[in-house]
């Protein structure tokens, strides 16, 4: 994306596997929230940039490739026991409850945080 043009589609946030942030914008943003140990910090950082009035644009060209994490190796795998899924969910690569609630509350507000914090547990209990 060319910084001085409106090239690219606007979006709400980003995954920081490949993101370019102009220096003057970087200097005006806080660092990634220390509440996050692994995931969600980059998405939260993008939302913070938008809240400060910056636009996020998706490049019209490929600038990199990142392989998705397969469901088979995550807490979402319904073939794992409930105990294993819960353990994986609470790991840094899952959705640790405090971090997940913090992310939701900060970016979507309290009601959404309460409801969506419970959904992973219901999915585990119901084997979904």
Regions found by a protein language model. Give the residues of each.
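A recurrent flexible, glycine/aromatic-enriched loop bordering the glycosyltransferase active site
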Residues: 2-21, 85-89
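A short alpha-helix capping/helix-coil boundary motif
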Residues: 2-3, 22-27, 78-81
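Non-catalytic, C-terminal membrane-associated alpha-helical segments of glycosyltransferases
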Residues: 71-72, 76-128
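Donor nucleotide-sugar recognition loop
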Residues: 13, 27-64
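Short Gly/charged-rich anion-binding patches and loops
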Residues: 21, 44, 99
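Active-site donor/metal-binding and catalytic loop motifs
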Residues: 52-82
């Amino acid at each position: 994306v060319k910084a001085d043009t409106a090239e690219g589609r606007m979006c709400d946030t980003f995954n920081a596997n490949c993101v370019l942030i102009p220096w003057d914008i970087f200097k005006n943003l806080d660092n990634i929230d220390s509440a996050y140990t692994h995931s969600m910090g980059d998405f939260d950082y993008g939302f913070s940039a938008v809240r400060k009035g910056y636009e996020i644009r998706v490049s019209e060209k490929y600038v990199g490739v990142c392989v998705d994490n397969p469901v088979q190796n995550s807490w979402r795998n319904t073939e794992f026991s409930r105990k294993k899924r819960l353990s994986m969910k609470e790991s840094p690569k899952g959705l640790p409850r405090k971090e997940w609630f913090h992310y939701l509350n900060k970016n979507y507000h309290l009601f959404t945080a309460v409801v969506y914090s419970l959904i992973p547990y219901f999915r585990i209990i119901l084997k979904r």
